[in-house]
């Protein structure tokens, strides 16, 4: 909106300041504003009050109202909370600027130094709901009229820094550009203060500036001395960012954004991408802001194959170094991926220019993420104390697919400012540090779902943001090492005592393990456990252990006619299928007594899973939480294999016999070979030796974890996410698992005909073969009626397609009454706008609608985010149901449509972030496993070598090996937990796809449907029923496990 003609130069300076798009323009226009008003810049909060008092300008009033509202919060004490505090903030990134704004509102004197002279990055940042409200409250719409006007909530990092820079200048923050912070200069004598070492040639006033608080926001590559950084490493992960020119044409406006497509649950998209372009990705995101911004994770082999990387180098820095990346090939790669993801609707993709005037496309490594061990420290010298705090990337490097950088960065900025407030109030150093570390413990766990829902109440006080806050979670005693009194020599702390005085916890020693096994097998006929070799050779001790933990599977009398190999094989198989304990050695090795280390490792898994379980007479024992996840996935995997084996013929399900099948164990004659070879276990794929921590068991066969990968794409196979082809015997990920029968594949479409274990499976009864899957209702029932063709009304189908099972519900209540038409309308509308990353759904809101930035619209948007949708009036219900079938008609209701689209996209983003968090954690687990395997191999070799090492040393090595085994078991069970969540995401995706497909049939007139259409519609309906029942089984399993794990 053009401002009226004004003769006051201050008004012109203000308008130029608000609209400035370059750092230098912002600074020069602000200096002109201050000169025109006769105000000295950088004068703290008093400067803001002077500007506001003298600039009586209608265009500024809305901005003053917002800043006054924020400053009037009681926590700031009218700008008097930190009036005697001097702060230095290093770094003018979003987090550093946000921290500076909070410190200024507290009344502190704030000086900020930044080594750059301009903001040049185009990257687009995802925003959580509270960050949107927070930025609006600081006047974001005034400075950037297009702020969060699309269906996805994001902003370019350049625009975010510009608007925060303008707020910081108005609030009196003193900013110095082109100044690099290189370190601290301690006070030389008593009475002096802390200063900064700055380059090059800082102004004399800045060089002599003494401060008592330092906030570092200089990025992950610069962390002040004294802080310890921990590396969180995963598998090699190569990210590619690309920014294309946004011409803001009508065609570009109508291309939907992609909030995230992840291979972990949407494999068909990536399979199509690979076939069409040869590009192999893990995920891709597309945001539309100042540029068309794409970010994706590419596979190294694909980059090598397409010539983006010249050669395969082991060091990541060299692999992605300038000399090894072909710029032209990288540009072709990014352009082709972006063009495919948007169906070519963006037209000619022209790269935006980076700060050096080159095409803005880059490959980067996010294999490792750095995280500071502590968030704050205190240094004291000559009586002068300095409080140091970290915010932004130097505190926690964000994982880009999760969109947590700005959100958690802002939270850390608030927490750091709260720490400064407590410091200014006179709280002791240890108390301040303990509170700050208590908050830091919460940071990595925060998400929009586990914070306070009312984002309007968020403020500097942590209690307004974090529910169930405990500021004493970390005690002052625990942070003494963060208080550095440089004048004194510290006595050795308890934490610095030699390792020999530390006690080991969390794993059983061999004596404790042997005693536990003796207790579990006591009273079983013919069993007397005295060691970890000969006592287990006949298989009876292992059967006794399984019998004690799972009564009813096999009575002692039934073992009389069973041979040692048969009994041992039975015990190993039942322990895996019914208790979730995967073997680490073969039945022959147990019989030969040749691998006591392997047996100790195997039995320690029993101990960790059942040591706290009480066994009452007749009571079926249950494994503790995480082993039950392994058990669930094992049943799911076997169910998938059985389903594929019964493609050509249906066979009635029967209980699996207690004797082993020939294919599940090696032949008996191999026993002598094992006896001679000692502890030899060989990988069945590569034929190389398997050490204990390397062993990965599938159906009684052992592999290296690194060897157990998809035969087609060589991707790592995780529990519940692979299948074995009965023809060639190879293992495949579900994406590349060959179809045995093409007709069946056509019937199933994109769905794998998996049958989830029903909740009854978790009661540890014998593992029967699953009954034939009925297409109408796969959930077993006491009396299954004859199958019949289901014909539902349109409304019944609409209700079915809108089902959404909530995984975190309590115990199952009685069936709910049918939902109101209002609920159905909202669900229908929401489904009509969901794109789930495949941009073929409803077009975006026209740009003309997005651009509205008047105050009434802004307030309306804020209300929409803060409050739930109001109940619909009865007369609107039928209208909205009709609109759900005709999304084009929603142009008549832009507010509803914008709100529903935004909320649908928010749900999509949550789903994508969840999938990416799982993927990242799985990669970290795999990397940690490799480290444990390498360490365990060294210990195992030392233990197996005939040497003159003292027994005490061997016992120490054995205890260390057991601790590594315990760590591995914990990682395996965590991996299983994650894969259950993957199954949940996969079923949600299948339900969404089927819902969309069914809605397409429903939207057609009944009279226009052919017989083939009717057949296909019923087929989709049957599949939808299957998926809904599978989700129900999964949720019931999770609920039963949750109830089982609750304290009595």
From Swiss-Prot:
Gene3D superfamilies: Calponin-like domain, Cysteine Rich Protein, FAD/NAD(P)-binding domain. Its cofactor is FAD. Residues 681-743 form the LIM zinc-binding domain. Residues 905-1048 form the bMERB domain. Residues 852-868 have a biased composition (Acidic residues). Residues 847-867, 906-949, 974-1031 form a coiled coil. Belongs to the Mical family. This is [F-actin]-monooxygenase MICAL1.
């Amino acid at each position: 909106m053009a401002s009226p003609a004004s003769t006051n130069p201050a008004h012109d300076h203000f308008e130029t300041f608000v609209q400035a798009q370059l750092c230098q323009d912002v600074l020069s226009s602000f200096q002109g504003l201050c000169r025109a008003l006769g105000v000295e810049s950088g004068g703290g909060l008093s400067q803001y009050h002077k500007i506001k008092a003298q600039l009586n300008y209608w265009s500024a009033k809305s901005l003053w109202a917002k800043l006054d509202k924020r400053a009037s919060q009681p926590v700031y004490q009218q700008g008097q909370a930190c009036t005697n505090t001097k702060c230095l903030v290093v770094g003018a990134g979003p987090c550093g600027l946000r921290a500076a704004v909070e410190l200024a509102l507290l009344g502190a004197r704030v000086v900020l130094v930044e080594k750059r002279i301009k903001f040049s990055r185009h990257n687009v940042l995802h925003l959580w709901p509270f960050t949107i409200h927070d930025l609006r409250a600081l006047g974001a719409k005034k400075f950037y009229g297009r702020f969060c006007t699309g269906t996805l909530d994001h902003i370019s990092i350049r625009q975010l820094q510009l608007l925060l820079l303008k707020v910081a200048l108005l609030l009196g923050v003193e900013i110095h550009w082109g100044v690099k912070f290189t370190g601290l200069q301690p006070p030389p004598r008593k009475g002096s203060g802390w200063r900064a070492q700055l380059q090059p040639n800082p102004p004399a006033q800045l060089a002599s500036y003494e401060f008592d608080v330092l906030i570092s926001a200089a990025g992950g590559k610069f962390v002040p001395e004294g802080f310890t950084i921990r590396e969180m490493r995963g598998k090699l992960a190569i990210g590619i960012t690309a920014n294309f020119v946004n011409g803001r044409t009508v065609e570009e406006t109508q291309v939907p954004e992609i909030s995230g497509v992840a291979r972990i649950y949407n494999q068909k998209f990536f399979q199509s991408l690979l076939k069409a372009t040869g590009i192999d990705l893990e995920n891709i995101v597309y945001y539309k802001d100042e540029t068309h911004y794409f970010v994706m994770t590419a596979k190294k082999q694909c980059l090598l194959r397409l010539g983006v990387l010249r050669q395969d180098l082991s060091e990541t820095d060299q692999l992605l170094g300038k000399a090894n990346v072909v710029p032209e090939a990288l540009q072709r790669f990014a352009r082709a991926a972006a063009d495919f993801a948007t169906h070519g609707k963006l037209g000619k993709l022209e790269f935006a220019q980076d700060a050096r005037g080159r095409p803005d496309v880059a490959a980067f490594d996010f294999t490792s993420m750095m995280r500071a061990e502590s968030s704050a420290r205190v240094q004291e010298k000559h009586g002068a104390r300095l409080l140091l705090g970290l915010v932004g990337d130097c505190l926690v490097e964000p994982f880009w697919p999760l969109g947590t950088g700005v959100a958690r960065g802002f939270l850390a900025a608030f927490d750091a400012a709260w720490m400064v407030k407590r410091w200014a109030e006179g709280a002791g150093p240890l108390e301040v540090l303990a509170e700050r570390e208590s908050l830091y413990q919460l940071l990595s766990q925060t998400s929009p779902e586990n914070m306070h829902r009312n984002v309007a109440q968020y403020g500097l006080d942590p209690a307004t943001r974090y529910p169930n806050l405990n500021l004493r979670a970390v005690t002052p005693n625990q942070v003494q090492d963060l208080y550095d009194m440089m004048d004194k020599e510290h006595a050795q702390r308890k934490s610095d005592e030699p390792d020999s005085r530390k006690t080991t916890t969390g794993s059983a020693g061999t004596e404790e393990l042997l005693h536990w096994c003796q207790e579990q097998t006591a009273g079983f006929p013919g069993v007397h456990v005295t060691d970890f070799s000969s006592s287990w050779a006949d298989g009876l001790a292992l059967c006794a252990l399984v019998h004690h933990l799972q009564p009813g599977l096999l009575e002692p009398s039934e073992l009389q006619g069973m041979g040692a190999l048969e009994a041992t094989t039975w015990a190993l198989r039942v322990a895996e299928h019914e208790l979730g304990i995967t073997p680490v050695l073969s039945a022959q090795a147990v019989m030969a007594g040749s691998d006591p280390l392997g047996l100790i490792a195997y039995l320690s898994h029993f101990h960790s899973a059942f040591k706290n379980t009480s066994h009452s007479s007749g009571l079926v024992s249950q494994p503790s939480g995480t082993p039950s996840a392994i058990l669930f996935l094992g049943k799911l995997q076997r169910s998938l294999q059985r389903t594929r084996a019964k493609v050509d013929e249906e066979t009635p399900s029967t209980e699996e016999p207690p004797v082993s099948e020939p294919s599940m164990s090696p032949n008996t004659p191999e026993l002598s070979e094992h006896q001679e070879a000692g502890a030899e276990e060989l990988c069945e794929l590569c034929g190389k030796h398997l050490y204990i921590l390397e062993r990965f068991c599938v159906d009684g066969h052992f592999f290296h974890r690194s060897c157990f990968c998809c035969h087609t794409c060589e991707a790592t196979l995780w529990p519940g996410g692979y299948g074995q082809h009965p023809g060639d015997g190879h293992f495949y990920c579900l994406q590349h698992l060959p179809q045995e029968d093409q007709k069946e594949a056509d019937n199933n479409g994109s769905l794998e005909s998996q049958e989830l274990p029903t909740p009854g499976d978790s009661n540890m009864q014998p593992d029967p073969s699953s009954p034939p899957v009925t297409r109408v209702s796969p959930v077993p029932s006491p009396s299954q009626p004859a199958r019949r063709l289901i014909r539902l009304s349109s409304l019944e189908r609409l209700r079915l397609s809108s089902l959404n099972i909530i995984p975190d519900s309590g115990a199952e209540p009685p069936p709910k009454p049918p939902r109101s038409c209002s609920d159905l309308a909202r669900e229908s509308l929401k489904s009509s706008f969901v794109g789930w990353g495949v941009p073929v759904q409803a077009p975006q809101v026209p740009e003309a609608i997005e651009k509205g930035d008047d105050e009434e619209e802004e307030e309306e948007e804020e209300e929409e985010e803060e409050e739930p949708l109001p109940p619909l009036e009865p007369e609107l219900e039928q209208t909205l149901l009709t609109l759900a079938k005709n999304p084009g008609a929603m142009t008549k209701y832009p507010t509803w449509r914008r709100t529903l689209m935004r909320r649908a996209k928010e749900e999509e983003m949550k789903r994508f972030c969840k999938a990416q968090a799982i993927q990242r954690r799985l990669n970290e687990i795999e990397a940690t496993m490799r480290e444990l395997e390498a360490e365990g191999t060294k210990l195992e070799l030392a233990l197996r070598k005939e040497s003159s090492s003292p027994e005490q040393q061997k016992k120490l090595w054995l205890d260390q090996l057991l601790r590594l085994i315990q760590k591995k078991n914990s990682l395996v069970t965590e991996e299983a937990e994650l894969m259950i969540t993957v199954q949940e995401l996969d079923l949600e995706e299948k339900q969404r796809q089927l819902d969309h497909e069914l809605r397409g049939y429903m939207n057609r007139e009944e009279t226009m449907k052919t017989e083939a259409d009717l057949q296909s519609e019923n087929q989709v309906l049957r599949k939808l029923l299957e998926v809904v029942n599978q989700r129900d089984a999964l949720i019931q399993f999770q609920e039963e496990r949750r109830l089982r794990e609750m304290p009595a």
